[in-house]
Each structure stands twice: as structure tokens, then as C-alpha cells.
């Protein structure tokens, strides 16, 4: 028995081990508030749905739909969906921003993929932060590059927007927006490596307005397929004006509009 001051101090091995374990656990636990994405929670409202072919025949136009069946209310909604494919020459596949007026956090489009791999989709909830899911996609090679020496034609025009259903008060309505616009990454493949041969040409942003209110914005990359076509949702009332503004990476701008009925 040892003494500390005038009181006996008994060293218990079991108690000491327990303290060591608690200290080790605290040392490796991440600090709260880092903002890192975590695996999607088990509840249905925070489950990211990814629809992409396991094997895509055309690497220049891989169809992809990402969505979260989540409330879209002013105090609780999905702010964004971010798509990446880390193994690709152009890894960022798009960031899609939503508001409560979007009605549904969902987007469908076509992307380029150079070699496929593990697709990562990160969602951000206004109340619960970021969460993610992963899904494997396989593609034929060559979607992110053009043969060396090939001159890619560059042109854009003919924007369009159309509704996929009649407007019902308070419900999210599917919308298709498209633009005739060529695109390329500016990359060529030489000796097994991707090399930037010229500046890319692509649609880099599509912004959705109801009247003068911005309700969604889609930030695109050189991985967007030629002649982009996007499907998304809006929550609106009959009689409002819907506008979609496309802007490419050279600042050229196109606009399509439709009165909702």
C-alpha cells in the first residue's frame, strides 16, 4: 500500500486499463464539425439513389440519374448533389444546387467517362450535413479524349425547355432542358497518358428560374456529354414563367423559356 498525502492510494490494474482505453478512443475519434461526408444514413429520406449502367457501351454519353427522396421545405431540404469519379481523367462530373422550390433533389444527364471506376455521389442536407454513396460503373475506354490531331467542331445553339407533366399546385413537376452544343475535354491520349492539347469547350452552367427567382443551378465540367440534356424538377403554380439559362466556358449564353400551364 502506498500513500498520497494522508490518504491511502490503491492502484487497481483493471481501472488503469479502462482509463487507457478511454484515452486511446478519444485520441482517434474525429473532432465534431469537420464537415466530412459520411455514409448515407439508413433512413429513407437520406438515401442517395444512383441509376447508372454497370457497363456503358458509349463512354462519351453515359446516362446517369442521381436523386434523394427527401423533404424539400424551406427549413429542411437537400442543398446539393456532387458527382465524382476519381479514376477518370476528368474526375468532377458535376455539382447540382437546389432550393426548396426545386421540389425534388434529382437530376438526370449524360456524362463522359475515360475508364470507369467507383462513382461517388455526395449530398448535403440543410439540417443534417453531408452524406455519400458509391457505385461502380464500367465503360469502354476513350470517353474523355479525342484522337491526337483531330479538329473538334465547336458550335452551340437551339436551347429548349419542356415539361414532362401538367402543373399541379404544390407538386414537383419534371422538366427537360437541352442545348445543341458540342463539347470536348481538350485531352488527347499519348503513350497511355492523357495530355492537354487545347482548351476544353463545354457548357459549364445551367441555371433554372421561376420568374426572377433562381430555384436550381447545375455546375457542369468538361465531362458533360455533347448536346447536353438535363431532367430536373420544379415546384410551381400554373401561369408562372420558367426559364433555363445556359452558359459555356467561353461566356456564350443561351436561354429557353416556357409559360407553365
Predicted regions span which residues?
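N-terminal secretory signal peptides
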Residues: 1-12, 19-30
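Extracellular Ig-like/FN3 beta-sandwich strand-entry sites
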Residues: 114-118, 239-241
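Short acidic/polar inter-strand loop motif in beta-rich domains
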Residues: 125-132, 248-255
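Aromatic sugar-binding surface patches on proteins
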Residues: 101-107, 223-231
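Short edge beta-strand/loop segments characteristic of extracellular beta-sandwich folds
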Residues: 63-71, 174-180
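Extracytoplasmic/periplasmic copper-protein system
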Residues: 36-42, 132-162, 256-261
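Beta-strand signatures of extracellular beta-sandwich domains
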Residues: 80-84, 205-209, 245
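N-terminal edge beta-strand
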Residues: 39-59, 152-169
Amino acid at each position: 500500500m502506498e500513500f498520497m498525502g494522508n490518504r491511502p492510494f490503491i492502484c487497481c490494474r483493471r481501472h488503469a486499463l479502462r482509463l487507457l482505453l478511454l484515452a486511446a478512443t478519444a485520441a482517434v475519434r474525429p473532432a465534431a464539425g469537420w464537415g466530412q461526408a459520411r455514409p448515407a444514413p439508413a433512413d429513407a429520406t437520406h438515401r442517395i439513389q444512383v441509376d447508372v449502367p454497370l457497363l456503358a457501351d458509349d463512354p462519351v454519353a453515359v446516362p446517369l440519374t442521381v436523386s434523394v427522396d427527401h423533404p424539400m421545405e424551406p427549413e429542411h431540404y437537400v442543398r446539393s448533389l456532387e458527382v465524382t469519379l476519381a479514376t477518370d481523367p476528368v474526375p468532377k462530373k458535376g455539382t447540382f444546387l437546389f432550393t426548396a422550390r426545386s421540389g425534388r433533389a434529382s437530376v438526370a444527364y449524360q456524362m463522359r467517362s475515360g475508364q470507369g471506376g467507383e462513382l461517388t455521389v455526395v449530398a448535403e442536407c440543410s439540417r443534417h450535413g453531408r452524406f455519400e454513396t458509391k457505385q461502380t460503373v464500367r465503360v469502354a475506354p476513350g470517353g474523355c479524349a479525342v484522337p491526337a490531331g483531330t479538329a473538334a467542331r465547336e458550335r452551340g445553339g437551339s436551347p429548349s425547355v419542356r415539361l414532362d407533366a401538367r402543373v399541379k399546385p404544390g407538386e414537383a413537376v419534371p422538366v427537360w432542358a437541352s442545348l445543341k452544343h458540342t463539347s470536348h475535354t481538350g485531352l488527347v491520349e499519348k503513350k497511355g497518358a492523357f495530355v492537354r492539347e487545347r482548351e476544353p469547350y463545354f457548357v459549364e452552367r445551367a441555371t433554372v428560374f421561376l420568374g426572377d427567382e433562381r430555384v436550381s443551378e447545375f455546375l457542369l465540367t468538361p465531362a458533360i456529354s455533347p448536346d447536353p440534356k438535363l431532367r430536373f424538377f420544379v415546384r410551381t403554380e400554373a401561369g408562372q414563367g420558367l426559364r433555363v439559362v445556359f452558359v459555356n466556358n467561353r461566356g456564350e449564353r443561351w436561354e429557353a423559356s416556357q409559360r407553365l400551364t
